[in-house]
A protein has these predicted regions:
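Catalytic glycan-binding domains that act on GlcNAc-containing polysaccharides
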Residues: 17-160
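Cleavable N-terminal signal peptides
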Residues: 5-6, 16
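Positively charged n-region of N-terminal signal peptides that target proteins for export
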Residues: 1-3
Length: 160
């Protein structure tokens, strides 16, 4: 067996390994965003940043699927099969909606809580100093703005 192949697979960008037809995912984003009354551009921006639309993405910390849900969060919001595109988007969108309520629609806090967990962000509000959280919030915000002001584009692949 060639030893370089497993190494290549480990180092190859994960979003290149499992590209699928985006149409169902886009449809589910629109459907669940409308159902939970949250911006589809926000949900799509989170997917852009979290998994780059790879439904089989797994983070180093164990987050799974398009919206990179941690196992407990996935179960809490109804995704018992976190790699199932519809379940992942439904649960992730429901989680975003809960965060929107908790943080009174402040997208900065919603993005920070999505990334770092809602408990710490609820305590710190905008006083968080973790550079990873700050960078994540700025990246999600940028993707959201790109999508919001370019609504004619499909939900997938808005990366400039």
């Amino acid at each position: 067996m060639k030893l370089w192949l497993p190494l290549l697979l480990l180092t190859f960008p994960r979003f290149v390994l499992a590209q699928v037809d985006p149409a169902p995912a886009e449809r589910f984003v629109r459907q669940y965003a409308a159902h939970y009354r949250v911006s589809p551009e926000l949900v799509a921006a989170l997917i852009d940043v979290e998994s780059r639309w790879n439904p089989r993405a797994v983070s180093g910390k164990g987050a799974m699927g398009l919206m990179q849900l941690m196992p407990a969060t996935a179960r809490r919001f109804g995704a018992f099969k976190p790699f199932d595109v519809e379940q992942n988007i439904a649960a992730g969108t429901r989680y975003v909606t809960a965060l929107m309520w908790e943080f009174h629609g402040d997208l900065r806090l919603v993005a920070a809580a999505y990334y770092a967990g809602d408990h710490g962000i609820a305590r710190e509000q905008l006083n968080y100093h973790n550079p990873d959280v700050v960078a994540y919030v700025l990246t999600v915000r940028r993707q959201f703005m790109i999508r919001k002001y370019a609504a004619m584009r499909p939900l997938r692949r808005s990366t400039p």
